[in-house]
Curated annotation (Swiss-Prot):
<protein>
    <recommendedName>
        <fullName>Anionic peptide 17.1</fullName>
    </recommendedName>
</protein>
<keyword id="KW-0732">Signal</keyword>
<feature type="signal peptide">
    <location>
        <begin position="1"/>
        <end position="24"/>
    </location>
</feature>
<dbReference type="GO" id="GO:0005576">
    <property type="term" value="C:extracellular region"/>
</dbReference>
<keyword id="KW-0964">Secreted</keyword>
<comment type="similarity">
    <text>Belongs to the non-disulfide-bridged peptide (NDBP) superfamily. Long chain multifunctional peptide (group 2) family.</text>
</comment>
């Protein structure tokens, strides 16, 4: 009985978190969501940095951190 209750609570929490995420990030549900944003940031010139939006800077920082991470390098050896 307790395992069924835990399973139901887990299912409800997944559904609620999915709904809240979709409401907080509606662009992820749209067809024009850019999944190749990191590829676009790969070929930046110095002049391009002046045109970046804050979200682009966050992606660029995440990409740089991922490249510096030793665990990331181990995955590709």
């Amino acid at each position: 009985m307790a395992s069924k209750t835990v399973l139901v609570l887990l299912l409800v929490s997944v559904l609620v978190s999915t709904f809240c995420t979709a409401k907080a990030y509606p662009a992820s549900l749209e067809d024009n969501f850019d999944l190749d944003a990191l590829d676009d940031l790969d070929d930046l010139d110095l002049e391009d940095f002046y045109d970046l939006e804050p979200a682009d800077l966050v992606l660029l920082d995440m990409w740089a951190s991922m490249l510096e991470n030793s665990d990331f390098e181990d995955d590709f050896e």
